[in-house]
């Protein structure tokens, strides 16, 4: 398996990087746990390079475009979770920012381990631009999960037409929606796949089509209905 992986690297990684990778593998072939983490992170980096290239061409397809509907509530959530600095214009630390990414994704799925490419929109919404790969998962405390559940209820209560819907119902109809995220004129544009019942979006009382927070360098424009 390691041999096959190495052959793949030789075909896809620049020559100057191969020596560093070879040195690491030689030193850690007896530590399978650490080597596994290294390979996972390396694969994520390669996947993200592909995504970055796609952004400049045709955009990147995502499956959680509906997360933009609740984006306006995320700064409040991050503050209550204690992730933000005192002036609320940024995160206290990289650890808090990573937690914010995984907390955002909890509105999409309860899965704990999430491939980094699936977190692309959450990274945009949290202003995460570090080249360092994200961990496979991020454990959230019970009080953090409880605050997320409270926010789910608040979103449903504030959206009059969806007030009697379960969160699972909202997930299947709006949150887990396909879209294409693209960089246009130095800002983000998200074009969301439309469905017949998107007429309900007109009843949302808050803005979700232009998203900008203090920690986001670029505006996210949402094209949806």
Q: Language-model segments: which ranges?
A:
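Short, compositionally biased pre-sequence/patch detector
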Residues: 1-225
């Amino acid at each position: 398996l390691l041999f096959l992986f190495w052959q793949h690297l030789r075909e896809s990684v620049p020559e100057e990087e191969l020596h560093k990778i070879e040195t690491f593998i030689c030193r850690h072939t007896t530590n399978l746990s650490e080597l596994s983490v290294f390979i996972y992170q390396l694969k994520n980096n390669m996947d993200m390079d592909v995504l970055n290239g796609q952004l400049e061409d045709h955009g990147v397809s995502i499956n959680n475009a509906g997360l933009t509907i609740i984006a306006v509530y995320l700064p409040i959530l991050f503050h209550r979770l204690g992730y933000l600095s005192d002036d609320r214009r940024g995160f206290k630390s990289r650890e808090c920012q990573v937690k914010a990414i995984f907390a955002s994704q909890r509105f999409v799925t309860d899965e704990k381990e999430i491939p980094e490419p699936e977190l692309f929109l959450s990274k945009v919404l949290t202003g995460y631009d570090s080249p360092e790969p994200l961990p496979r998962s991020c454990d959230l405390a019970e009080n953090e999960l409880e605050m997320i559940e409270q926010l789910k209820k608040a979103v449903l209560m504030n959206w009059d037409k969806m007030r009697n819907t379960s969160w699972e119902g909202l997930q299947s109809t709006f949150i887990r929606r396909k879209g294409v995220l693209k960089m246009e004129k130095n800002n983000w544009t998200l074009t969301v796949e439309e469905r017949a019942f998107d007429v309900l979006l007109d009843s949302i009382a808050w803005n979700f089509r232009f998203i900008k927070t203090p920690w986001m360098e670029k505006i996210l424009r949402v094209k949806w209905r």
